[in-house]
């Protein structure tokens, strides 16, 4: 089972919060103290809370659940995409479009347009267009791929959100709350933990910390999915490799 130790977290700087003047008092239970006007997060809370989150995400994956990774700020963007791809899940790593979950019907139409344009770009349709029209469609394809590429094969709403930076992604969290989709999120000392079902108190800016969270979640999801395949193999539903 995927787990992360206190040593791993210390090495990655998970315990460094934000400057004390930017704190959210709701995070007080998770703060150990302050050093040089920077809040220090109590890892004695974070370690078990993160490992509980990993276990739950693994369970969701073992039931064929779809997990949407969300991290649109620059520090997290590439790692979010890589980790989601690494465990065959889904991601939003650029701008969160308002209504991405709550207005899924419209989003589905945009995904259909994206897939149509992908086919056109590959089957020679673009070559038959005027230069201007081909350029316009290429730009439209790039724009749609950037915003929806990570969810184009999701085929419906996700079963859980894993979020890097609850403060930055508050719109995504609100939408998930409205739909009853469980939210797992890294919550720093400047963020509001309300609306997060599985709080992971920790640094949400350091690349090493972000990579630690994402790597562990991807491992937990892969393990969960392999459990599902093992069960199916036992029941004769799939051939064991």
Curated annotation (Swiss-Prot):
GO MF annotations in UniProt: structural constituent of ribosome
Alphabetized PROSITE patterns for the sequence: RIBOSOMAL_S2_1 (PS00962), RIBOSOMAL_S2_2 (PS00963)
Keywords: Ribonucleoprotein, Ribosomal protein
Source species, domain of life: Bacteria
GO biological process: translation
A cellular component annotation (GO) from this entry: cytosolic small ribosomal subunit
HAMAP family in the record: Ribosomal_uS2_B
Family named by the database record: Belongs to the universal ribosomal protein uS2 family.
NCBIfam families according to UniProt: rpsB_bact
Protein name, UniProt field: Small ribosomal subunit protein uS2
Organism (species): Pectobacterium atrosepticum (strain SCRI 1043 / ATCC BAA-672)
Lineage, uppermost ranks: Bacteria, Pseudomonadati, Pseudomonadota, Gammaproteobacteria, Enterobacterales
Gene designation per UniProt: rpsB
